[in-house]
């Protein structure tokens, strides 16, 4: 190859490298300026409290009447404490209630791995004690948070007066649902899980740092829908949720919980039932979105498994368990039907009496 051509190629490569570096620096500056602006727009909900080796964000409101339990809210995977915003304000009208950001979420520090339910439950216990928020508690959990509060109950049984599982995860759901799916769907879902794990663990923080995700959101191109972009939420809250999703620690935390999920499943199997504690299981009854690969019969079987089998099993975790189907809600009941959560949960606990507003 002629030397002039080699020199030209080398110059082109150097120029390309310089352009990429400048773009990366520009993206990082764009992200830093945007983050500074957002931090002023969206002040912290709650306060940071030292819980062992890390600081966690705890948001408590409402008064605690004598003899009443305090309500503690735990979110699903990928949802910060902000996901309870429509529930929190209503419960606070008649009870003391606290939501919190798990390690790496929202305004909380990242936590040590593996991010199993036992570790999460112990961190929550340390947080509540450090904040002076004493039991007994009514533990309310959405999705993956259900694992955490069930483990919490097994570790600290004297602290838990009652439980509300809002579309709580079931230890057998993946295995049982896979039995109903064709091989093509199983392969598709496995690839999607692997891709999402890589995005959260590696590409997610990089996209945040370079300002790529912010650019997508602010230009309206590819704005992600994480269940918190519902029209039920005011525009400012939707923007605040996207701001919290743009923190690099957030993607790492979601990925870490996902990697530790098999361990959490093993922990929940050992945790056992909930005894005779009052238990309400809220179940989304809205039909699943159609899947082009699945037949109507297969979709019906999946819905029946989810609503009438797995969730009913959860209700049987306690001798005083009750399932309530919310017919017009998706999995995101705290957003779609916060009133159902408020009514179910606030079953108020006073001197060993559980009164539910839902009959």
For every predicted segment, state its role:
Residues 59-61, 99-140, 156:
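Active-site loop/oxyanion-hole signature of alpha/beta-hydrolase fold enzymes
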Residues 309, 317-359:
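Catalytic active-site module of serine/aspartate enzymes centered on a nucleophile-bearing elbow/loop
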Residues 134-180:
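Conserved hydrolase catalytic core segment
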Residues 57, 61-107:
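Conserved HGGG/HGGXW glycine-rich cap/lid loop of the alpha/beta-hydrolase fold
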């Amino acid at each position: 190859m002629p030397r002039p051509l080699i020199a030209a190629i080398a110059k082109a490569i150097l120029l390309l490298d310089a352009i990429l570096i400048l773009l990366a620096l520009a993206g990082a500056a764009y992200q830093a300026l945007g983050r500074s602006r957002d931090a002023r727009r969206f002040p912290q909900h709650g306060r940071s409290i030292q819980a062992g080796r890390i600081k966690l964000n705890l948001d408590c409101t409402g008064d605690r009447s004598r003899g009443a339990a305090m309500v503690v809210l735990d979110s699903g995977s990928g949802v910060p404490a902000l996901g309870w915003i429509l529930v929190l304000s209503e419960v606070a009208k008649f009870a003391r209630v606290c939501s919190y950001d798990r390690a790496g979420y929202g305004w909380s520090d990242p936590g040590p791995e593996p991010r199993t339910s036992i570790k999460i439950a112990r961190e929550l216990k340390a947080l509540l004690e450090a904040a002076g928020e004493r039991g007994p508690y009514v533990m309310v959990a959405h999705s993956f948070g259900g694992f955490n509060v069930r483990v919490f109950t097994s570790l600290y049984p004297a602290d838990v007066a009652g439980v509300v599982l809002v579309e709580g995860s079931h230890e057998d759901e993946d295995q049982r649902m896979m039995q109903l799916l064709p091989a093509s769907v199983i392969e598709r879902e496995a690839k999607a899980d692997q891709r999402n794990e890589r995005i959260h663990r590696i590409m997610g923080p990089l996209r945040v740092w370079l300002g790529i995700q912010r650019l997508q959101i602010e230009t309206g191109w590819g704005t992600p829908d994480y269940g918190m972009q519902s029209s039920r939420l005011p525009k400012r809250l939707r923007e605040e949720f996207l701001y919290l999703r743009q923190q690099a620690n957030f993607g790492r935390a979601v990925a870490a919980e996902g990697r530790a999920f098999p361990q959490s499943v093993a922990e929940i199997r050992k945790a056992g039932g909930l005894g005779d504690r009052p238990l309400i299981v809220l179940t989304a009854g809205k039909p699943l979105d159609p899947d082009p690969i699945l037949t109507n019969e297969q979709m019906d079987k999946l819905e029946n498994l989810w609503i009438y089998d797995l969730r009913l099993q959860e209700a049987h975790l306690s001798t005083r368990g009750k399932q309530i189907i919310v017919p017009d809600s998706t999995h995101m009941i705290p957003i779609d039907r916060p009133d159902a959560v408020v009514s179910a949960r606030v079953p108020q606990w006073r001197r060993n009496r559980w009164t539910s507003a839902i009959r």
